[in-house]
Amino acid sequence: MSMFCYQCQEAAGGRGCTVKGVCGKTEDIAKTQDLIIYVVKGIAIYSSQAREIGLNTSEADKFIVESLFSTITNANFDAKALNARVQEGLKVRQSLKDAIIKAGGSYNSKENKSWTSKFLSVLGIKNDKDEKEIHDAAVWAANNPEDFKKKAETVGVLATENEDIRSLRELLTYGLKGMAAYLEHANNLGYDEDSIHAFMEKALVATLDDTLSADELTALVLECGKYGVDVMALLDKANTSTYGNPEITKVNIGVRNNPGILISGHDLKDMEELLKQTEGTGVDVYTHSEMLPANYYPAFKKYKHFVGNYGNAWWKQNEEFEAFNGPILMTTNCIVTPKASYKDRMYTTGVTGFEGVKHINASKDGKKDFSEIIEHAKRCSSPKEIEKGEIIGGFAHNQVLALAPQVVDAVKTGAIKRFFVMAGCDGRMKSRNYYTDFAKALPKDTVILTAGCAKYKYNKLDLGDINGIPRVLDAGQCNDSYSLAVIALKLKEVFELEDINELPISYNIAWYEQKAVIVLLALLHLGVKNIHLGPTLPAFLSPNVAKILVENFGIGTISSVDEDIKMFMN
């Protein structure tokens, strides 16, 4: 069977990639990622049971989160690392199984008979009260990449034959991938929430359950949105407690004459470590793409060698990384297949990877040694200037709520007629120029609320302000879509409305990968309706599942700029 992947917006032909991913991943990489997901589901069978009886599941929790994150679009293209993850997963699964069996031996008193029956059932051990055959995901075994390859042929997306069940399972899985990304960042800062892990494991197990109906899976998808809100709130707490609340900031987009390191991705802990280790070395630090919002945090402003932001959204990195001249650190997705001209200057860390690119691992205490990349930078020329000037951002919920009286007054007086949430992702497709044209064409009495790399379609346009309020309010990274939800809920309270959809807020969101999926599900959980997704609807939504979202939540897509603005403003 050839590869099949349709998890991102750029799925070939709007249906799915079957020869090679548009993202650049090979058939072998795609299938190994399928197998990682299958291994994770097997681990979840045991970890959910272990959690129920009070066993420590921290090792499994960590592995599940990191593994889901490693399969997000544009995160990891390193076959060796991915195969090693499969091998490690089988060991984690076996360790959990052994712990449950050991615990069962000491919990077989009369009052624990029902529990004993239950855990024996989970293990596939027959007993007179409860017989259950354990799922293959919990028992299959292999020892080498060739055997992994054979197994991967049988466990891909298309292994689920029913189109609607497949669609719901994948929608749930992609939501979990986005959730895992946000949870990983919170964990790196020492923040965690057991209920989120418990839901992730429950949901993973549910994707293996052939007895679940479409209605039951739909309910789980919506429940995923609830935990999406929880995980974004957790990450918001982790980021702001550690680095302070983002504040209005003018960010330099020019360059200086010192050698520099360009840091891309989302991990603020990596950002902190890099700034600390480069201080006093003569090496400057620049953010790229989704790391731009690091400029808004007070804790990072004390570093004089933190220059600003270089370049634009992830998909332009081939040209921009070449022009930067210095080394690049990829902390998370999005990686584009690197050009030979800068591949030897590229470094990955965390769950990211690319074959032939140097990887920086964390030590046992979680620390990372960036000395190699710093020494590399010293041997490089300073960055080539590709633009100059400043952009403004830092409008997360704390900052916007501090401006609440000004904002509320502008709404009440009619100075601001409508807000447009244009959060989400940027991408390569030319049809995404729609979002630039849309921003330009919006009436002057409207304000754009944004988060994520979608902002690069319009954050350098001169759209002016309304009574001192910029017409583009950038909350931060894609996870900071949480801030936009908090702002909306506060406005609902201030205006004493019963329904969040009564607010003068429209949602025109550009999506690309799986973090956008969890943001969408979170918004649905909060009751937001009539969200428009573009530039196309997800390929993984079957006609029937898409119909459910349209009929129950008013989900739509985009048409032309003029038609859409007319529709939104009426």
Swiss-Prot record:
Q: Which terms does the record give in the GO molecular function aspect? A: 4 iron, 4 sulfur cluster binding; hydroxylamine reductase activity; metal ion binding; peroxidase activity
Q: Which residues carry this modification: Cysteine persulfide?
A: C425
Q: What is this protein called?
A: Hydroxylamine reductase
Where along the chain is hybrid [4Fe-2O-2S] cluster bound?
H266, E290, C334, C425, C453, C478, E513, K515
Entry function: Catalyzes the reduction of hydroxylamine to form NH(3) and H(2)O.
Q: What is its main location?
A: cytoplasm
Which Gene3D superfamilies does the record associate with it?
1.20.1270.20, 3.40.50.2030
